[in-house]
């Protein structure tokens, strides 16, 4: 039997992401983050020496909470990095002075031209997010500044530029603010100066992303949900003759909340593509030859794929596996599986998988008869003793386009190893189950998701998922809205609710959130001012007086997505109605908690709260 997962191990874990082979395949670099600090590190591919931090002078942008697209190689001896202040800088891979390439706005998703003479990147300002190109010119008179970047895109949002191998073209992913990228978006191919721009994929009702030219330059691959599922498509370099690499009812991408997603990679010879296949929350690394035929190499989620050197480098994780930078050899090992080595692990020393649990897929009928999916974690022992049903924690993901995926989720394992069962629902609106499942939430956020989770609550006893008399609900961000509405409308089935940086006021969110989500609610709630009453009715703050179960509200004071005032308004309304509520604000934390001391407090505070109101009540 395993031991409870210590909060200290969770709090001391590092984030790892965006691994890339250096040209030539002798080195690998990736991003490591601890707390609010992130850096790019470089290591020999054979692991002969420890990774070396190359951004100590300037830091690197975060890869979590909407962060991503942090860096790229520029030749084999430099890196273009988005530093901690959002500038684009040039960093020598072996150490040396840092050069500023652009300090206009905030940079992201850099991509070097094949000759290293220019960097394409996204340049975000208050009113625009464009693909821009900046030349990498020699220093003049000791200046550390380069030339001004030139905008080449013209949509509301443009991300993830990619160069053709001969430097003659750029491709990128763009969309307009009347939609989110997973609603509808476009792949554009243009000259490096933006000339001859042509939309080659996507458009009305179709979501696309991750454009990537083949190493030889004869083909362009990207993800598209034109079949109803995010599959990898391949066209010629001009975007003509597109067809899916395979047509599967599995997703091969996640919603693009941030730039830099790499869920597939070309082989060095362009003859095959490696892809992470989402199998209803579980996942596999699969290689498919362009001539036909697929081979599963490894189980588990693989993010940030890059194929070079002696294999496929990625960040691998699973329910019992903390994220690690791994290299999988696609040509060796047992049939169906590739050999794998670990270059870096996010978990600190002392991490053990003993006692951690693999979830089981579950489903139940929604109140309207539709099928709702989820994952159920069964603990090795019940927190209430042998022979008893375990208390159940229902944890609702954010988004609401998130997914209860079989990835490393320490929140779930923390409670499972303490004798709680965990149900992680995927109410409709979640991704991972096809486009129709996601788009079923159109106009119904705050209603259908609540109904789907309520139907799950009704199944707890009959399905034996846990003790129906000892149920707690937790949720973060969009999932916090669903959790709080469940507490208001179905509180008779719940003992306590925990909200982490939750949306509580939809009208307020529409007025104050950041630009990326400024029109998000148009599709999943309704258009303003026409549907203002719907916004009010779907807001937890409107129903605060009906929340009669104990409530814990956790919030960061630096949250740019959900302003802290939303938590304050909810807490004040619950207290005014005579409800029981605890409220804690974490200094310096944004939309998602990162600091070691915050994480330690969050787990301790939540565990004490649930013990008081669920286990000991």
Cite the ranges covered by each PLM segment.
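Beta-strand-rich domains and repeat architectures in extracellular enzymes and scaffolds
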Residues: 4-41, 69-70
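A short beta-strand motif characteristic of beta-propeller blades
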Residues: 5-10, 52-54, 58-61, 97-102, ...
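Non-catalytic accessory segments flanking enzyme active sites
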Residues: 17-20, 38-39, 108, 122-123, ...
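Blade-terminus and WD-like Trp-Asp/Gly-His loop motifs, strongest in beta-propeller folds
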Residues: 19-27, 71-77, 110-118, 161-169, ...
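A flexible loop/linker signature enriched in serine peptidases of the S9 family
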Residues: 31-41, 59-65, 80-89, 102-107, ...
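Blade-loop segments of beta-propeller domains
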Residues: 50-76
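Cap/lid segment of the alpha/beta-hydrolase catalytic domain
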Residues: 346, 350-469, 476, 509-515
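Active-site-proximal cap/loop segments of hydrolase catalytic domains
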Residues: 427-617
